[in-house]
Structure formats: C-alpha cells, structure tokens
From Swiss-Prot:
Bias (Acidic residues) ranges: 1396-1483, 1490-1501
Induction line: Up-regulated in a number of cancer cell lines (at protein level).
Domain notes: The protein kinase-like region mediates the threonine-protein kinase activity.
Record protein name field: DDB1- and CUL4-associated factor 1
UniProt record, GO biological process: B cell differentiation; cell competition in a multicellular organism; negative regulation of transcription by RNA polymerase II; positive regulation of protein catabolic process; post-translational protein modification; proteasome-mediated ubiquitin-dependent protein catabolic process; protein ubiquitination; V(D)J recombination
Source organism per UniProt: Homo sapiens
Protein location: Cytoplasm; Nucleus; Cytoplasm, Cytoskeleton, Microtubule organizing center, Centrosome
Residues modified as Phosphoserine: 202, 255, 828, 895, 898, 979, 1000, 1328
Length: 1507
C-alpha cells in the first residue's frame, strides 16, 4: 500500500512541477530547482524499476517493457509536454550560458535517456553535440561527466559518430586518462582505509554455482572473423533486443546488431513463470534438475540487502557525483566507440585491457552497475582480433568466469562470450586452456542459456551456435546434457502450445518467443552439422579398418571445423549410402527420446503462419535443415511417417502425417518463391526415399559410432523402412508435389537446382513399382514433357544444375521405361517401343525402281547415251517421264537432315548396351557424313550374313538381304575421334592397319535403305515385317484393323448391318457416337419470365423428361415444359442459389443443394404435394445411391454422410483425416452397384465402412467420379483401374472439368464450370481454354469427339436418357462484368446447326455490340449497375426473338418420344447424305435405349402440385 502511495505521489509531484514550470517559464525565475527535483523523481523511480530485475539489455521504453511501472508513466508525462521538452533541449542545453542550468538540464536529459529517441535530439538539433564535446573537455564537474554520458547516447548513432571522428579521437584519449586516474585513486583510497569489501568472506565465490541447474546448448556455425569493422560486425551479429518505440532508440550494445531483431524483455513474474514451465518440462521428460532459484534461498548466507549491489545495483542517483558514477558514464561513452578500427590504437596504447580487467572484477569495484558498463565496453573491444587475443592470453576468460551469478553483470558476460566466439583465433586459444577452464566456460554459458535474462539466454545460444565447430566445446556440451537443455528452450514456449498459442502474451513477448525459436533452431542445426562430421569420420574409419587403407586422423579438438552446405549434403549422402542399416547415432537417439522430431514439425507448421515475423523463413529453414541431417537415421525417417498434432486454418487442432508438412513446404504452399526453404524440404524427402535398397556387404561389420556398442541387425529393416517411406510420400501426394516442381520457373536463379532435387527425389521414389506404374502414364512421360524440360536450363548461368537435372531425368526415364537412354534424346515410352520395331524391320525395295531413278538422273544431266545403254541392259521401260512426278518429291524428301531421329535412338541404345551380335541383326544405320564403313576386322567382326561390300568384284547388288551392322563403322569412327582429340593413343600397328583399310564411300543401297528406314520410322504403327518398299510412292504401314472392322462412312455402315449387326462391324458403335455427339443444334432458350435478369444456376431433366427443372440464384425451383417452353411450376426451396438438382428415377423425390442458406441440402417429395421430406443441414452436396436409390450420400467438406431415404437417419460417416486429400470441390458418390463410395479421392467399402485405397492427388479441385461400367474411376485427368488401382490413362482435356455421362455410359461430357469465388474463376479462365465450351469424349477409350464452343461461360449441363437433348446453363453476361444473367439453352443432339442459324446469331451479336456502344455514349450519367442491366435485357429480348423465329419449325415438330422417333425415321429416308447420317444415328441410339421410368403420370403429378 505504501508503494502505491509513493507512486501516486511521484506522478502527482511531477505534474505539479510541470505546472510550476509553465507558470515560471520565461519570467526569469531560476529553473534549476525544478529540473533538479524532476531528476530526483526519475532517479528514484529508475531504482524502483531496476528492483524488478528487468533485462539490462532490453532497450525498450520502460513503459512498454513493464506497462505497470511508474518510471514509464513519468517519462510519458514528460514527453507529452512538448513545450517543456523543447525548452529543455533548446534553451537549457543549447543556448543557455549558465553552468548550473546546463548541469541540471544535462542531468535530467541523462535520466530520461531510456525513453528518449536520441536520433531526433542529437541529429536534428544543430549545435548540441558540439556543446557536449566542449563541456566534456573543459567544463567543471558534474557537467563534464554528464555531457560525457550524453555523448555516449549520441555516438550510438553511426552517422553522428562518423561526423565527429577527430573530436572522438581527442576525447577518447582524455577520458581514458581520467579513467586511469580514477581507478588509481580508488585503489589508493582502498589501501589507505584497509577496509574489507562486503564480499570478502572467504575464497569461495559469493554466489556458489549450482552445477545441476546448468543447462546446455549446442549449435554449429561457420565462423566469420570480425576485425572490428563496423559494418561487418553489424552484418554478422544476429542478435538485438530493439523494439520500435515512440521515444527511444537502441542502446549502444545493439548498435552493432541488426536493428529489426527486436527487443526481449522479461520482468520478474514472467521469468518465474518461464522457470516454472522449464521445471515442468524437465519433470515431464524424466530428467531431474534442481531449481535455479535455490541459489539465493539455500546456498547463500547473506541477506538481500548485502547481495543487491552485486545483482541489480543500488546507486542510480547521479548526484552527488562520485568516482563510481563518473567512471560509469565515461564507460557509457566509450562503449559505442570500442568497435571502431581507427580508435583501436588509442585503446591499446592507453591500456584499456588492464583497465577492463580491473573493472570486471566485482571484488575490486563493489558496484555491479560499473562492472556491467565495463562488460559492455569490453564486448565492443572484443570484436578486434588483436585485443581479443591479448585478453584471452592474459587470463581474461578466467576473470569473466569469476563474475557471480545470477547478477546483472553475469548477463553482461553473455555478450562478451558471444562477441568472443566470433573471433576464431581467440576461441582456439580458449579451447587450448586447461580442461577445467573450458569446462567452466561451457558450464557458465549453459547456466546463462537456461537461467539468465532473455538477452543472456539469446547470447548464450548464439555462442554455442558458433562454437559447436570446436570439438572440445561440443564434447563438453554433450557431457553436461546440453541437447536437452537447448531443446527445452523451444519445448517450453507458450506460442507452441496448441491450445492457446500464447493468446495471453503481448506482442513483444510473442516476438521474443519467436526469436528464441529461431536462435534455438539455428543452434540445433550447427550442433547436428558438427556431429554429422564426427559420425562421418567414424564410419570412414570403420570402413578403412574393414577394407584396409590408411586411417583418417581427425582434426585437433581446439581447431574449428566449418562446412559449406554442399559438404553437408555430401556427408549425408555418404552416410545414407554407406552407413549401416541400423545406424546408431547418439545425438539422434537423444533427440528421439525427447520427442523433438514432432516438436520441430509442429514448430515448422506453426511458424508458417507467422506472416508478420521478419525471420519466419529463417526459422523454418533452420528446422528443416535439422530434420534433413537427422533423416540419415532410418528411425528418424519413420518418425516422419507418424501423425503430428498441428493447427488447421481455423485454428483447431488436427492430426497430420509429418511428411505432409514437409511436402507442403516443398511445394511452396506457405513460402512463395523462397528457394532455400524448398531445397531444404526437398533434401529431407531425398534422404527418405533415396536410400540404398540393398546395403554393401562390408558395411554390416560396422554397427555403431562406438566400438563397444553392438546392435542386432535385421537385414530386412532398411528395405522395410524404405518401402514405408515410399508409400507414405506417395499417399501424401508426394508425386504431385515433385512433378509440379519439375516445371518450376521461379525464382529464376534457383529453379534449375530445385528441378534437379525434385527429379532426384522422383528417381528414388520410382524404385517403387506402384509409383513407377503411375508415373509412366502421366504426360511427363507419355507426352515427352520431361524431354522438353531437358533441352534448356531456366537460367543459362545455371547450366551445372541443369546438367544434374538431365542426369537424374535420364535415370528416371530409364527406371520408368526399363531401357537405358542417351541423355538429351527426345523420346517417350511409345517412341521407344516404335524404335524397337523399326530397328528389327527388314528393308527391301524393287531393283528396277532404283535403276529407273538412276536413268532419269542421267537424262536430267544430259548423259542420254549412257541412259539409253542402261535402259537396254536393265530392260527398263522406255518412257523416261513415267515416274517423274513421283520421283521429284522423293528426291526432295531424301535429305537426312529433315528426317526423324528415332532410328538413331535405337542405335544409341544398342551401342550403350554393347550387344554387338544383336545390333548386327537389328540396329539401324544412321545416315552419316563420314566415309563408308570398312569391312569388319579383328575383334569387331560380327557373325551373321556376309556383307556385300566385302567383295567388290560382285557386280550385282542384292537388295533383299540382311541389313549390315552400323557398329563396324561406328566403332572405328569412335577410335578415330578419340585419336584426333588426343584422348586415345593408338599404337603404330593399329595406325598402319587403319591406313591400309581406308573407309570407302557409302554404297548407294545403304543410302536408299537408310532413307526408307527413316520413312518407316515415321509410321504411326510400324510393323517388323514389311513388303518391299517403293521408291516412287511414300511408304505407310497400314493401321491395325480387324477383319470385320466397320467402315468409317455412315452409309456403308448402315448397309453392312444386314451382314454384321449390330453396328455394321467392329467399332461401328464408336463411329456412330463420333458422328452423333459432334453435332449440337440450339433449339430453344429458357429464361425467367418476369425478371430483368435471368438467374438459373443448375438444371436437370424430370423423370419422364417432359419437363426441365431449373434452380435459380434466389433458391427457387422452376419447372418448364420442354416442348412448349412454358413455365409449369415454381417452388421456394432455399434462401440462396441452388447448386445441384437430382430427381429420383421414379419421379417421386428430388434432391436439392444450395450455396449457404440452412439447410444446405434437402430431400423433397413430388407426389401429391411438394414438401420437404428430410433436410441435410451441413451437407453442401447430395445425391442418390446409384442402383436402388434407397440411400442418399451427402458431402460436408472432406466428410461423407450416408442417410436412409425413408427415415432420414444417418447410417454412416466416412472420413479419415490421415487419408484426406482436401479437394476444394469434393463430392462423394456411390459406384453403380452401391457397395463402394468415392470420397475426397479415397475409395471406401460401404459395408465395412473402411477405406480401401487412396488415389494419388494430381489436382486441387476435382475429387472424382465412377465410370458407369464400374471398373474405372475418373479423377480430373487421371483414369484409374478399380481392380488394380493402376493409372490407366491421363486425359489432359478433362483438366478442371465436371464430367457428365450419358444414360448408356458410352459418352462423356466435360465442361469447365464457374468457380465459386472470383480469384479461382480468373485462375481457371487463364488455365483452361475451355471456359466457354464443353467437350464430348468416347467413354470407352477416352478419345475426344468434339469441342463445342458456346461463347459463354457454362454453369451446368445435363442430358436426357435418350440422348435427344442437352441442356446447358449459360451466362449471357459479359466475361469481365460482375453481373450475372444466366439462361438455359436446349440443344438437340446429333443435329447440325443450319447455316441460317449461324448467320442470324452473328447478326444478333453485332446488334448487341452496337446497342452496347450506343448505350455507353447516351447514358454516361446512368448508374453502372442499371446500365449493365438495361443492355443485357435488350440484348436478351432480341436474342429470344431471333431464336424463336429460327427454331419455329422445330418447336412445332416437338412431340412425345414416339412421334419424335417417327419424324427422325422419315427425315432419314429423304434427307441429304450428311443429315441422313446424323438422323439415322439418332434413331439408332434411341432405338437401343429404353427408359426405366416408373412414373407414367408425370403430367398429372405436376398439375396436382400446381393446384
């Protein structure tokens, strides 16, 4: 209560003083008493604030660090009074010439520095710094010391320090001499008085060290030696505690650090809470530790009054001036200048090191504030290599370790150790100290990491990050259980608590926690990198002991070992490849025991959502790098296959597989164009899927890092782990992620490397037969996409990465195809098979055709007599021009340059395989420019038919013979090439042999044969056994055709039905479907009658198909007569747009779904009264079961619900979060027999409610449908076999299309539907060329039939059971406009659009455009929405008129189905050929299809409903 009163008094007194100042200001009164009293108030509250033991490096405004503290309130009161602050600086400091007033003002300014924006004061107020320099040199006490302290605040700004270099050089020397004098006076006074210090009790330290409370940390970091250059220091130091404040800048301690690295503040209560969390975590993990707070309570015999001078300090008043205060303020000035290289000689010359050794000894100073300031100055000097080396050599480290803890000075030690760690030479000397000294250093730093202020913890963590490269430090860290201590830093973070994520924390505390996470992950990465190198040495030494060789001697423990990222990757690859199957690695075992893999995965998942945190990317990357190193151990890999609790987008806890988090990051889902993160994530995947499936035998002898430890080995365990990882990566859509990364183009500087890594992961994954089968059917291989990617790098400067990508891509092709390839060959799997057939084909041609060509050539060159002789001798026909027309194109096409390269591929394969005998019989010879192959010699001779070229005496060339092997010539040519380039040294004997057998020119028959083989290679379906080729007519292998193949011409097929029912031969039905479903004729348009804009959203035919059911955007259901076009009924079903309609087959029930209103879906009765039977509140999509229609399946997000139609009860819920694919437009559906369900890309058994199989995900939206044949599943572009779960085909044209089958299941409609939101809509419009069109496909072989462009965006489409009509919901509005005017257009299937229809439609579109232009000119002032409405309305009315006129005859001819069939038959007899074909085909389909409807009284039902 007293404290509260005092606080209130302070606040009130300051307010009173300000009021008094306002009265007396300008009246000539003496202001010194007012300013002095203000200073006393501020100093008193500063001491109270410091009693809370705040972080001494926390440079935030005190009111921000502790909103309850009175110091913050007082500072705010002062800063709000602009008049007073301006007078304080301008009048009392800058312009006044009265020393007492100057002194009082400087004292107050010094007191309020913790809340002051120093840059504003010292940079914007000209002349103030000059005044301070003058006073610091010449003024009397205490003004001289106050101005020196204020200059310390000014010099924190680097720009100011740079502007006053000369003044600083002079003043530094002056104050150092003063410091030396004051220190000597202090020593002399102490010796004179002989008074013992309060601390001089015994040789024991004042505050005994609690060894058990010391926690340990580790990390490894490439050491950057800091020479003291300001900018280098600021670049390397990744630690700061500055948070932006309205009044205050960073303190000098942080001027060498990154300013955005934010402020860390921990008040007393927060510290106690953190320690409590820490203790709980340790108890939970099963480790014992004493409470660090025991230090005071149990281990000290002294009272707090005696201890406080060494813990928080007591002397916060600046008057009267004492030597301690003067020394403290001088050190405050020197601290920001300590890091400047140009001032180092002055510091060295004037004995700064000896001074600092004195000041950091609390036994000498008896003032923790003075010692703390000295430690800050010492830290800045330690940036210099020379000073740091001398400091270590003269026992400086031991002096630091004598500083008692906990205390403010101990936190200062943390910064000294951190800065010292940056100096590699100095750290080497530290590591060469006696073992107990280095042990104390590690121990002390571990205590700082666990029990110090937040800044001390951060400095200690960073110290270990750098020093893990020294093996001596690493070993001591492990000895003191450092890994657990380090991990506890993040395991106790509130922001990783999934329940509240630190909801009660302030922004500063959240930022501080994130900083802790970042620094800890960085230290963990360095720790495991250092251990990885040690483990690699152990494995190599074991291998060398086993297989012989010289042992590798490790580097001395006091030497730093730093490694590049490439070296780390190589180490991981070596351990995975050559390490034992049951690799035992102590750090990984400890990490596993502490459940830290799940912890890191949670951190990655949560950190992905730290959108405002500047180091979010670094934090995630460090954590990923740790996991990458750890995944060299199979046990850790298996941890990634386990479930982890993470937060979803809504903030609720969900369970997901660890590898899915990694895959999400690799895909770039959270970090757009951050290549480093993607590469780290890919490295984890590579480590998991690229391990050896069979280990080298000698490795089995090496079990562990320590010779003593032997583990039982299961030879199958590594294969089991590998197979499990393949499966878990595949089941979490790893194939999709990796394939998407193969075509990545951004960021351009790293795209090639990301491609290479993704391809490497695919190579490892493709060893799984399941994955291999799926990949082989994807466009990547089936359409040569991977060869296109191999042609050019994304960035020419990254060719080395592209070469790696090509290497892995070639390996991937070899794995998938089963055949070796030459890198860079443009080949798909189909081409490989084709090339194999071509290579085996025997090429022959008529002899006389060649002679005719020769004769024609001779005539064209004017050699008529020779031609005549040839004609007589060869008995050729006399007419020279008979084949000239055929000859010309053959000659023109004979250039080998323009021919396909496929035969060369086959030849390349054969050459690589080296099967000379086989090649001799089958491999083709490429046309080459080098001389003709010589006869085979020596080892190159091949068995087989004799080579005609061997005997030049034979006059007649045999054309029908086995083709010579190209390998003879190729082999010799390879030898010659190597010789020419100096890569192969021939012996003189071989050279002479080659000279004797110079290659002869290619023979004419070899040129002709090669030309014909190239022609044969162009055949779509080449056959191995061919008839003789003609030189005058292009060769074409016949298409594969069955004996009873139906003719393509419809009339011929119709005539053949008598012989070959039922479709006129094999594939007749397919030809019929191609004819019918490529023709659609618009016949009528349905729109809402009384509305300005029509708003249909979905459509369905009624059971007997006399009516068209249309859902509107207002939730109404409207029924239109198909034949008259009149609206027959209207019902209010929902309060939002209807998205789906499905009537039952008997017409008695109807399912509807809406966008957002409750209920989302409903089941309606349509017998005597239209009423709601059941509602499905949360299911956004519902449909009937296929076979019996006794159940309804509803979809809610990723969950499927099955309901009973009679009772409405929920029968089953089908959902497994571990298998979820999270398709955006998931729609659960039954298979044709109702015993299987496809939901979210997962196949379920309805009877057992168990998931059967998860189909791989290759798109984000479409969840898939069953083919009506019940044997296949179609998910977007992929066709899956239900019996084997193999991927059968990919149909790129189906991308992002909704699939609708006709009643017989023989034809498939695909339409890209409108997206739910505008972003998706624009994305899909850009992605797909079919936004305003629908396509038809043959549902038996998935070949496209036709693309019908309706020139408007499609919302929905449906077809009737007889394949007569197709209804399409089209948006009449502009593509770019936000307004929507949707109508339902009815198309007649199998009818061609008439020419007059097309002309009228073009005229109508032109008129619409003209009207829009006129309206824009006339109605500039009209409201935008009204303008759009009017235009669309006028255009639509006119279009309706045109359509009605155009389709009048058709409308009159409408009648029930029997009459329609009769009309079609009549038209088929009299019509022209094309129309006859179409009409007959329509009759054919309708004749074979029968309706299964049970409702013969549909008209009566509709009438009764209306009544």
């Amino acid at each position: 209560m007293t404290t509260v009163v005092v606080h209130v008094d302070s606040k009130a007194e300051l307010t009173t003083l300000l009021e008094q100042w306002e009265k007396e200001h300008g009246s000539g009164q003496d202001m010194v008493p007012i300013l002095t009293r203000m200073s006393q108030l501020i100093e008193k509250e500063t001491e109270e604030y410091r009693k809370g033991d705040p972080d001494p490096f926390d440079d935030r405004h005190p009111g921000r660090a502790d909103p309850e503290c009175m110091l913050g309130h007082l500072l705010r009161i002062l800063f709000k009074n602009d008049d007073f602050m301006n007078a304080l600086v301008n009048a009392y400091v800058m312009t006044s010439r009265e020393p007492p007033l100057n002194t009082a003002a400087c004292r107050l300014l010094l007191d309020i520095m913790p809340g002051l924006e120093t840059a504003v004061v010292f940079q914007e107020k000209e002349g103030i710094v000059e005044n301070l320099f003058k006073w610091a040199r010449e003024a009397d006490q205490p003004l001289r010391t106050y101005s020196t302290g204020l200059l310390g605040g000014a010099m924190e700004n680097q720009d100011i320090a740079a502007n006053y270099r000369d003044e600083n050089s002079q003043l530094v020397a002056i104050v150092l001499r003063r410091l030396r004098e004051l220190q000597l006076q202090e020593v002399a006074l102490r010796q004179e008085n002989k008074r013992p210090s309060p601390r001089k009790l015994s040789s024991e330290p004042l505050l005994p060290l609690d060894e058990e409370a010391v926690d340990m940390d580790y990390g490894d970091m490439a050491v950057d030696v800091v020479d003291g250059d300001q900018e280098e220091a600021s670049g390397d130091m990744e630690i700061s505690f500055h948070l932006d404040s309205g009044h205050k800048t960073s303190s000098r301690v942080n001027s060498t650090t990154k300013p955005e690295d934010g402020g860390l503040k921990k008040n007393k209560s927060a510290k106690q809470g953190d320690r409590e969390n820490f203790r709980k975590a340790k108890q939970k993990l099963g480790f014992s530790s004493s409470d660090p707070d025991r230090m005071f309570v149990e281990l000290s015999n002294s009272s707090w009054s005696e201890m406080s001078p060494w813990v928080i300090g007591t002397n916060y008043t600046l008057y009267p001036m004492t030597p301690a205060i003067e020394q403290r303020l001088i050190l405050q000035y020197l601290t920001p200048l300590g890091e400047y290289q140009e001032l180092l000689p002055i510091f060295m010359q004037l004995g700064s090191r000896e001074l600092m050794m004195f000041y950091i000894d609390l036994k000498q100073t008896n003032d923790v504030l003075l010692t703390f300031e000295a430690l800050k100055h010492l830290a800045s000097l330690l940036l210099h290599n020379k000073f740091a080396t001398e400091f270590v050599a003269h026992g400086g480290v031991q002096k630091l370790l004598e500083i008692p803890r906990p205390s403010m000075a101990a936190t200062g030690v943390s910064m000294c150790l951190y800065y010292l760690s940056y100096n590699q030479d100095a750290m080497e000397r530290v590591c060469m100290h006696p073992h107990n000294v280095l042990s104390d250093v590690v121990n002390y730093t571990l205590w700082l990491m666990e029990c110090s202020h937040a800044s001390g913890c951060c400095h200690a963590t960073m110290f270990f990050s750098i020093c893990f490269s020294f093996r001596a430090v690493l070993e001591l860290f492990d000895r003191y259980d450092g890994l657990r201590r380090l991990v506890n830093l993040i395991s106790t973070l509130e922001i990783l608590n999934l329940e509240d994520q630190g909801a009660l924390l302030s922004d500063d505390e959240i930022f501080a926690s994130r900083q802790t996470g970042k620094h800890t992950c960085m230290a963990l990465r360095k720790y495991f990198e250092a251990h990885l190198a040690i483990k690699l040495e152990q494995v190599k030494q074991s291998l060398q002991r086993t297989e012989g060789g010289i042992l590798v001697h490790p580097q001395p423990p006091y030497k730093a070992c730093s490694y590049t990222h490439e070296q780390i990757v190589e180490m991981m690859e070596f351990l995975i490849e050559y390490g034992p199957a049951q690799l035992y690695w102590e750090p990984a075992e400890v990490f596993l025991k502490l459940s830290c893999v799940q912890l890191l995965l949670q951190l990655i998942s949560i950190a992905c959502n730290w959108k405002t945190y500047y180091a979010r990317n670094d934090t995630v990357r460090f954590a990923l790098d740790v996991l990458a190193i750890l995944t060299v151990v199979p046990k850790i890999q298996l941890q990634l296959a386990e479930s982890v609790d993470v937060l979803d987008e809504a903030g609720s806890t969900v369970s997901t597989v660890g590898i899915s988090i990694i895959l999400g990051v690799a895909e770039g889902e959270f970090f757009i164009h951050d290549a480093e993160i993607q590469k780290s994530a890919l490295q984890i995947i590579i480590n998991c899927v690229c391990g050896p499936d069979n280990r080298i035998s000698s490795i089995g002898k090496f079990i562990s890092g320590t010779p003593r430890r032997k583990l039982p080995q299961n030879p199958k365990s590594s294969e089991h782990t590998l197979a499990k990882m393949w499966n878990v990566v595949q089941s979490n859509n790893g194939i999709k992620v990796l394939l998407s990364l193969l075509s990545i183009k951004m960021p351009i500087t790293d795209a090639d490397q990301i491609r290479a890594l993704a391809c490497k992961a695919l190579v490892g994954l493709s060893r799984s037969s399941t994955v291999r089968q799926i990949i082989s059917k994807l466009p990547l291989f089936s359409s040569c996409q991977i060869q296109q990617l191999m042609k050019e790098p994304v960035l020419q400067d990254k060719r080395s990465d592209h070469v790696k990508f090509c290497k892995y891509a070639a390996e991937l092709i070899e794995r998938v195809s089963g055949k070796p390839l030459l890198i860079g060959t443009d080949v798909s799997l189909a081409r490989l098979q084709k090339a194999d057939v071509v290579a085996q084909s025997r090429i022959s041609f008529p002899e006389k055709e060649l002679l005719l060509l020769i004769r024609n050539h001779l005539i064209s060159k004017g050699l008529g007599e020779t031609a005549t002789v040839l004609t007589k001798e060869a008995d050729l026909p006399m007419t020279a021009a008979s084949h000239s027309s055929a000859f010309t194109p053959v000659t023109a096409a004979a250039s080998p340059v323009s021919l396909p390269r496929t035969p060369r591929i086959a030849n390349g394969i054969a050459t690589r395989l080296g099967s000379h005998a086989a090649v001799g019989a089958s491999a083709p010879s490429a046309p080459t420019a080098h001389p003709q192959p010589r006869p085979p010699q020596g080892p190159l001779a091949l068995p087989g038919p004799s080579y005609a070229g061997n005997s030049p005496l034979i006059g007649r060339i045999s054309f029908i013979r086995e083709r010579p092997s190209p390998c003879n010539g190729r082999k010799i040519r390879v030898l010659r090439q190597k010789s020419d380039h100096g890569a192969y040294s021939q012996s003189p004997a071989i050279k002479k042999q080659l000279d004797r057998h110079l290659p002869s020119p290619p023979t004419l028959d070899s040129i002709i044969t090669e030309y014909l083989r190239e022609q044969h290679a162009r055949c779509k379906n080449p056959v191995a056994t061919c008839p003789p080729f003609s030189l005058f007519t292009p060769h074409q292998c016949p298409e594969p055709k069955q004996r009873r193949q139906a003719p393509i011409n419809f009339t011929s097929r119709l005539n053949r039905r008598a012989s070959f029912p039922k479709y006129g031969g094999v594939d007749g039905g397919c030809f019929d479907r191609h004819l019918i479903f490529s023709r659609f004729r618009p016949i009528s348009v349905f729109r809402e009658a009384n509305e300005d804009e029509s708003g249909f959203t979905c459509c369905a035919f009624s059971a007997r198909e006399r009516f068209l059911m249309l859902g509107t955007c207002t939730g109404q259901l409207k029924l239109y007569n198909v034949f008259s076009g009149q609206e027959e009924a209207s019902y209010n079903c929902h309060n939002s747009a209807i998205t789906h309609l499905e009537p039952s087959r008997d017409g008695s029930l109807l399912l509807t779904s809406a966008t957002w209103s409750q209920p989302l879906s409903a089941l309606w009765g349509m017998k005597s009264v239209f009423d709601m039977k059941h509602s499905f509140t949360e299911d956004h999509y519902v449909e009937f079961s296929k076979h019996s229609q006794d159940r309804v399946i509803g979809t809610k997000g990723d969950i499927a619900h099955i309901y009973d139609i009679q009772t409405g009860n929920k029968l089953l819920t089908l959902f497994n979060p571990d298998l979820a694919n999270n398709y955006k437009r998931n729609c659960a559906t039954f298979n044709p027999t109702d015993d299987l369900v496809l939901n979210d890309g997962v196949l379920w058994d309805v009877r057992s409610a168990q998931a059967i199989h998860k189909f791989d995900k290759f798109n984000m939206n479409i969840s898939g449908v069953f083919h009506p044949n019940g044997l296949e599943v179609i998910i977007n572009t992929e066709i899956w076999d239900l019996r084997t779960f193999h991927l059968l085909h990919t149909v790129p044209a189906l991308d992002q299309c909704r699939v609708v089958f006709n009643h017989t299941g023989t034809v498939m409609y695909g339409a890209m539907l409108q997206a739910d939101d505008e972003d998706d809509l624009m994305e899909e419009r850009m992605k797909s060329p079919f936004g305003s069109s629908f396509r038809t496909f043959n549902a038996t072989d998935y070949k496209p039939i036709a693309t019908i462009d309706v020139k408007r965006n499609i919302f929905d489409l449906c077809t009737d059971t007889k394949d007569c009509y197709l209804a399409v919901i089209e948006n009449q509005g502009s593509m770019d406009a936000l307004n929507m005017d949707t109508v339902c257009r009815l198309y007649e299937v199998g009818r061609q659009r008439l020419a007059e229809d097309e002309d009228e439609e073009e005229d109508q579109e032109e008129e619409e455009q003209e009207e829009e232009d006129d309206d824009e000119d006339d109605d500039d002032t009209d409201d935008l929405d009204e303008l759009d409405t009017d235009q669309l309305l006028e255009a639509e009315l006119e279009e309706d008129d045109n359509n009605e006129n155009a389709g009048e005859d058709g409308d009159n001819d409408f009648s029930p189905s029997d009459e329609e069939l009769a009309n079609l038959l009549e038209e088929g007899e009299d019509g022209e050929d094309e129309d006859s074909d179409a009409d007959e085909e329509v009759e054919l389909i309708l004749g074979d299809t029968d309706s299964s409807d049970n409702s013969d009284l549909e008209d009566d039902i509709i009438l009764s409903l209306n009544e």
